[in-house]
């Protein structure tokens, strides 16, 4: 990766857009409020960078390293984050609407109150994430790993969670209306107060789960329809 001085970064960011920043090293850089919309940042090193309130809408961040970066209230609408590393990243209140995060790694990331509506998160590793009050409505989470994650009060309306790993996830008071949970693993998950109206739980594993009414799941029928 190409490492840059503070002056070089300042000079570069004031050039005509969109910028070509593939494989650039901006780790630890102070980039708050910066406009990097539509920029090419594939495989860039942005680890520990300060990107609070940054505009990264439509940016190409494929396989970029954003681990432990700060992206508070950043705009990442329509951004391409496929295979990106977002481990332990602060994504509080970030806008990831319609963004792509296929095979992304976001272990222990903070996505509290984030907008992930219609985002594509297929096979994303979001183990132990904070997603309380996040908007995941209509998101594609097929095969995603959300084990141990905090999804309390989250909006998962019409989300596709087919084959998702939700073991020990806290889904208390979450909206799972019309969600597709086919073949999902909800073992030991907490569903207290969750709304499962019209949710599809066919083939889902619920052993040890705490159900919306506070009871522990015991029966194992062949097919379950939320209601």
Which functions belong to the PLM regions below?
Residues 3-227:
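Tandem repeat scaffolds
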């Amino acid at each position: 990766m190409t490492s840059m001085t503070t002056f070089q970064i300042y000079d570069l960011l004031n050039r005509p857009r969109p910028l070509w920043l593939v494989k650039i090293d901006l780790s630890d850089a102070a980039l708050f409020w910066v406009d990097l919309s539509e920029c090419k940042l594939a495989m860039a090193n942005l680890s520990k960078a300060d990107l609070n309130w940054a505009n990264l809408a439509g940016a190409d961040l494929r396989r970029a390293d954003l681990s432990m970066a700060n992206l508070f209230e950043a705009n990442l609408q329509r951004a391409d984050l496929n295979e990106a590393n977002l481990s332990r990243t602060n994504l509080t209140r970030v806008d990831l609407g319609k963004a792509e995060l296929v095979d992304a790694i976001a272990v222990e990331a903070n996505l509290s109150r984030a907008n992930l509506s219609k985002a594509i998160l297929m096979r994303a590793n979001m183990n132990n994430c904070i997603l309380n009050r996040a908007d995941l409505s209509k998101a594609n989470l097929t095969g995603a790993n959300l084990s141990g994650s905090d999804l309390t009060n989250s909006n998962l309306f019409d989300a596709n969670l087919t084959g998702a790993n939700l073991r020990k996830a806290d889904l208390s008071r979450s909206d799972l209306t019309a969600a597709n949970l086919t073949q999902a693993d909800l073992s030991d998950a907490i569903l207290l107060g969750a709304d499962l109206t019209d949710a599809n739980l066919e083939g889902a594993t619920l052993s040890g789960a705490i159900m919306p009414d506070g009871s522990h799941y015991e029966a194992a029928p062949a097919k379950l329809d939320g209601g």
